[in-house]
Amino acid sequence: MKNFQDKVKKLVAEMRRVNQIHFIGIGGAGMSGIAEVLLNEGYQISGSDIADGAVTQRLAKAGAKVFIGHQAENIEGASVVVASSAINESNPEVAAAKEARIPVIQRAQMLAEIMRFRHGIAIAGTHGKTTTTAMISMIYTEAGLDPTFVNGGLVKSAGKNAHLGASRYLIAEADESDASFLHLQPMVSVVTNIEPDHMDTYGGDFEKMKETYVRFLRNLPFYGLAVMCADDETVMEIAPKVGRQVISYGFSEKADYRIEDYQQTGFQGHYTVVCPTGERIEILLNVPGRHNALNATAALAVAKEEGIANEAILAALADFQGAGRRFDQLGSFIRPNGKVMLVDDYGHHPTEVDVTIKAARQGWENKRVVMVFQPHRYSRTRDLFDDFVQVLSQVDALIMLNVYAAGEAPIVGAESKDLCRSIRNLGKVDPILVSDTSQLGEVLDQIIQDGDLILAQGAGNVSKLSRDLAESWKA
């Protein structure tokens, strides 16, 4: 422990040439986590975001200087600027930093510096990485290891998305969206799945994306460990190319850590994990869905391979409350047509939406599933249009909101009205397009029935809309 602390002190001393670290997009989940860890390490932190919120307010209260809006003068005093992947070269703070010859780096480059003298565990994949990161963090915490963790979403059990621990362990979500996870040099890497997403980063070439994952895994030292999902065809395709020890997990009979007998009752999942030694471990989860069983088994595999006792693993998983905006129950409400349950979920890729619907069907077999879906980005809607049409046709009733642009310009044929038309033509559900979100509650009241499960689905502001709706329904 002393040797590790001496190394960290050396790194901090070397970085003391950095007087102030400025984050552009400090309110983002990944950015705020790194800012919080560095703030707790004693650095001066400043940052800007386009909107105020709970995250920016928490950072300001902790001592960060937070600006709302992007302006050149915000970087005054900064020794380095960290920019999120959503920030482009035309941003006034980026331009001002470059003019002043202040280094501008990616989020993952700063995360790599934090990881440099630590035992890094990096979790990557198209889906499930936030929840898996949270689960591993809670297992290591339960084991008394006090890890540092940086997650892309709220770890509900901890009440935050980042923590500066006293031990050598650093558990971090790795971002493939801009390929910046290649900066990381972990000891253990997890890959949950690989599917086409953020394809602009990879020039629309899925083969290039797969090769980038191989490069990420080859960043492991020769004695490192790759924990990979046996159920994902693409993950297993690249596994032989990694050149490092690979441990697999999943429902597949070929998995090293194999899931058996999964059952779900409401929010609870029960199943057995058969370990490589033949040991059988009974798991209780308080988060629903087979996808969460996969996430938990990835976390279990990491912990078992690193020598953590079963007691800590089982206790952490049984107590796990979920990650923020992952099948997040907002409450049950009495409406004019009966009692309904409202759930908020971040899933915005067809596969994520699909597993959320399946979790709802499996846990609440006799309920209608009513979805309020907000597509996220025109480019994603265009690239995965047919998949969205098929997946969204599985619900009993569908309200479609306008595409949340996330800074993108509209793309012809990739708007919500286009999705609605194609879903309607499929003939399974008749979607309702709600362009004025102030009418959402009224429209819902017209279509919901007693016992309905309402899923507010998407990565944009649909979460705020659903939470505002929940507050109004409580009144």
From Swiss-Prot:
Gene Ontology, cellular component aspect: cytoplasm
Metabolic or biological pathway: Cell wall biogenesis; peptidoglycan biosynthesis
Molecular function terms, GO-annotated: ATP binding; UDP-N-acetylmuramate-L-alanine ligase activity
Database matches in SUPFAM superfamilies: MurCD N-terminal domain, MurD-like peptide ligases, catalytic domain, MurD-like peptide ligases, peptide-binding domain
Protein role: Cell wall formation.
Family classification: Belongs to the MurCDEF family.
Name of the protein described by the UniProt record: UDP-N-acetylmuramate--L-alanine ligase
Taxonomic source organism: Glaesserella parasuis serovar 5 (strain SH0165)
Origin organism lineage: Bacteria, Pseudomonadati, Pseudomonadota, Gammaproteobacteria, Pasteurellales
